[in-house]
């Protein structure tokens, strides 16, 4: 089954949770243990990537995951090095509010042939960085959307939808002190029919409930997993929070 179809099947019943693993933060073996714990906690898939990912570390981690877990592995590339044949799909995304054309379409053009050759399912996605933006905001030369300007985010989302992007990601940044504002999530969801993904600053079941309740179809957590002593329990808390709305 294609990953996009998998998403739609789940969304007929409930929200989706994805766990983000950065290959540079642990060994492939440790990544497998994190993924297994997250799956036991209720996650629906593993996102793999980071803002500064090394291709060899990514490939080794993707292969280890492929051999040991059954949920989809979705690449979350920070550059052209963020591609591996061992993944099921890739968020083929444009960093919409970058000031550098490289991140809007240049890197995508450079990586497209590799994705095609490897036969990875490409999920067309608009990616928007919201204040504070974190590492991705700095690396990606962005003008982060102000937290009190939901209409700007909605305008980007509608433009992305009209350009054919079927997914839209609101990103507060890895380790952000707060998640994307609920008003912004709600307005974007009202304005488009895209699968709406929200990540950054989601640390608790309460955070996840607010984000999902505002309209997020997919909730992503990463830093909270890296910092947790009990990944299974933390993911379960977040997934249960999402299920409460």
UniProtKB/Swiss-Prot annotation:
InterPro entries: GGGP/HepGP_synthase_I, GGGP/HepGP_synthase_sf, GGGP_HepGP_synthase, GGGP_synth. Keywords: Cytoplasm, Lipid biosynthesis, Lipid metabolism, Magnesium, Metal-binding, Phospholipid biosynthesis, Phospholipid metabolism, Transferase. GO terms for cellular component: cytoplasm. Mg(2+) binds at residues 22, 51. It is found in: Cytoplasm. Pathway: Membrane lipid metabolism; glycerophospholipid metabolism. Its cofactor is Mg(2+). Belongs to the GGGP/HepGP synthase family. Group II subfamily. NCBIfam families: GGGP, GGGP-family, PRK04169.1-2. Prenyltransferase that catalyzes the transfer of the geranylgeranyl moiety of geranylgeranyl diphosphate (GGPP) to the C3 hydroxyl of sn-glycerol-1-phosphate (G1P). This reaction is the first ether-bond-formation step in the biosynthesis of archaeal membrane lipids. This is Geranylgeranylglyceryl phosphate synthase. It comes from Methanothermobacter thermautotrophicus (strain ATCC 29096 / DSM 1053 / JCM 10044 / NBRC 100330 / Delta H).
């Amino acid at each position: 089954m294609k990953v996009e179809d998998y998403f739609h099947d789940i969304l007929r019943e409930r929200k989706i949770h994805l766990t983000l693993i950065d290959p540079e933060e642990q060994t492939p073996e440790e990544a497998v243990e994190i993924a297994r714990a997250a799956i036991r906690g209720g996650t629906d898939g593993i996102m793999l990537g980071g803002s500064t990912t090394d291709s060899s570390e990514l490939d080794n981690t993707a292969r280890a995951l492929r051999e040991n877990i059954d949920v989809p592995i979705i690449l979350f590339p920070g550059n052209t090095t963020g591609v591996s044949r061992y993944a099921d799909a890739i968020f083929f995304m444009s960093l919409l509010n970058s000031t550098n054309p490289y991140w809007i379409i240049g890197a995508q053009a450079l990586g497209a042939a590799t994705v095609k050759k490897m036969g990875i399912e490409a999920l067309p996605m608009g990616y928007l960085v919201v204040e504070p933006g974190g590492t991705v905001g700095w690396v990606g030369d962005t003008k982060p959307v102000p937290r009190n300007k939901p209409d700007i985010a909605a305008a980007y989302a509608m433009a992305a939808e009209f350009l054919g992007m079927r997914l839209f990601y609101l990103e507060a940044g890895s380790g952000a002190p707060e998640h994307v504002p609920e008003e912004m999530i709600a307005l974007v969801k009202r304005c488009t029919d895209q699968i709406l993904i929200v990540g950054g600053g989601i640390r608790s079941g309460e955070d996840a409930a607010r984000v999902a309740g505002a309209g997020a179809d997919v909730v992503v957590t990463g830093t909270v997993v890296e910092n947790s002593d009990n990944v299974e329990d933390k993911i379960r808390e977040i997934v249960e929070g999402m299920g409460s709305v």
